[in-house]
């Protein structure tokens, strides 16, 4: 599933190509995603100019003067950009569900083999969208700090990994990056969240920020379907220290990395290095 680094990579890829441009047409090949696409989306968007693009958690936001297009990549989604300078727009296949065509010939194509993503039109106040209004702080923002995390975990008895992946605590830290952050911070994913000391919260905050920033720099992780707006794979998976390394030697102590299920997600950790 695309997590925050993959969504941020996508944002940085599409924004320069569509900001300030006017939608000419929308081609809908498949309406049934996680939530059905409005069949009138083409009529709604045609003639509207993109003011800006942004991201909140794992949601991409395309802003117009009187509304936003909210895009979620789901389990396997990606956005590709085709420009007139490419010479030829790639021929769509059965997984290419939506094309947004701009007046200068640029095309933004949504691809989603598993169809768990979403493309939603909304004309209300952005921050009050039901999918956005209860989200926690961005992990790379100043709001996600030691004091915030320490206070937020005090009343939580559940495993710290589950708390870290809760979007009401902090957004965008999915399974891959939760595993990587906890390993690098030396904290067991099973530790009750309210047992973390303040200095451990400080280390964890710093580690989460560093892991996510590095993942963005390397274009995110491509394990199956994810590609950026140019169709290129990310390569942060080459830097994994624990995720996907069960029964392999720990890179710190040489012991075997363990894989268990926690909250229905694969959890990788070293019993020696993480306490």
UniProtKB/Swiss-Prot annotation:
Q: Which GO terms describe its biological process?
A: base-excision repair
Family, according to the entry, reads as follows: Belongs to the FPG family.
ZnF FPG-type residues are: 241-275
Cofactor section: Zn(2+)
> Could you identify this protein by its name?
Formamidopyrimidine-DNA glycosylase
* InterPro entries from the UniProt entry: DNA_glyclase/AP_lyase_DNA-bd, DNA_glyclase_Znf_dom_DNA_BS, Formamido-pyr_DNA_Glyclase, FPG_cat, MutM-like_N-ter, Ribosomal_uS13-like_H2TH, Znf_DNA_glyclase/AP_lyase, Znf_FPG/IleRS
- Record's function text: Involved in base excision repair of DNA damaged by oxidation or by mutagenic agents. Acts as a DNA glycosylase that recognizes and removes damaged bases. Has a preference for oxidized purines, such as 7,8-dihydro-8-oxoguanine (8-oxoG). Has AP (apurinic/apyrimidinic) lyase activity and introduces nicks in the DNA strand. Cleaves the DNA backbone by beta-delta elimination to generate a single-strand break at the site of the removed base with both 3'- and 5'-phosphates.
The signal peptide, as residue positions, is none
How does this chain assemble? Monomer.
Q: HAMAP family given for it?
A: Fapy_DNA_glycosyl (MF_00103)
Q: Which reaction does it catalyse?
A: Hydrolysis of DNA containing ring-opened 7-methylguanine residues, releasing 2,6-diamino-4-hydroxy-5-(N-methyl)formamidopyrimidine; 2'-deoxyribonucleotide-(2'-deoxyribose 5'-phosphate)-2'-deoxyribonucleotide-DNA = a 3'-end 2'-deoxyribonucleotide-(2,3-dehydro-2,3-deoxyribose 5'-phosphate)-DNA + a 5'-end 5'-phospho-2'-deoxyribonucleoside-DNA + H(+)
What Enzyme Commission number(s) appear in the record?
Answer: 3.2.2.23, 4.2.99.18
Residues at which DNA binds:
95, 114
Q: List the keywords (alphabetical).
A: DNA damage, DNA repair, DNA-binding, Glycosidase, Hydrolase, Lyase, Metal-binding, Multifunctional enzyme, Zinc, Zinc-finger
Molecular-function GO terms, alphabetical:
8-oxo-7,8-dihydroguanine DNA N-glycosylase activity; class I DNA-(apurinic or apyrimidinic site) endonuclease activity; damaged DNA binding; zinc ion binding
């Amino acid at each position: 599933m695309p997590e925050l680094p993959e969504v941020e990579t996508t944002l940085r890829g599409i924004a320069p190509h569509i900001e300030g441009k006017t939608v000419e047409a929308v081609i809908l090949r498949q309406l049934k995603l996680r939530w059905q696409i409005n069949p009138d989306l083409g009529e709604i968007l045609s003639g509207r100019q993109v003011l800006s693009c942004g991201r909140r958690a794992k949601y991409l936001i395309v802003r117009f003067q009187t509304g936003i297009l909210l895009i979620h990549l789901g389990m396997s989604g990606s956005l590709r950009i085709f420009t007139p300078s490419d010479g030829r727009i790639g021929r769509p296949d059965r997984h290419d569900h939506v094309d947004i065509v701009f007046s200068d010939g640029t095309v933004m194509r949504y691809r989603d083999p598993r169809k768990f993503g979403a493309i939603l039109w909304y004309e209300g106040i952005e921050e009050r969208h039901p999918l956005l209004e209860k989200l926690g702080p961005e992990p790379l923002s100043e709001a996600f700090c030691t004091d915030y995390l320490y206070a937020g975990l005090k009343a939580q008895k559940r495993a710290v990994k589950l708390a870290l992946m809760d979007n009401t605590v902090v957004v965008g830290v999915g399974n891959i990056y939760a595993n990587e952050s906890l390993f690098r911070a030396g904290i067991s994913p099973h530790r009750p969240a309210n047992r973390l000391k303040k200095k451990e919260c400080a280390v964890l905050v710093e580690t989460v920020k560093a892991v996510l920033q590095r993942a963005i720099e390397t274009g995110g992780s491509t394990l199956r379907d994810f590609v950026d707006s140019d169709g290129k794979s990310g390569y942060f998976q080459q830097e994994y220290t624990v995720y996907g390394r069960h029964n392999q030697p720990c890179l710190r102590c040489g012991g075997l990395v363990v894989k268990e299920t926690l909250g229905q997600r694969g959890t990788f950790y070293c019993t020696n290095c993480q306490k």
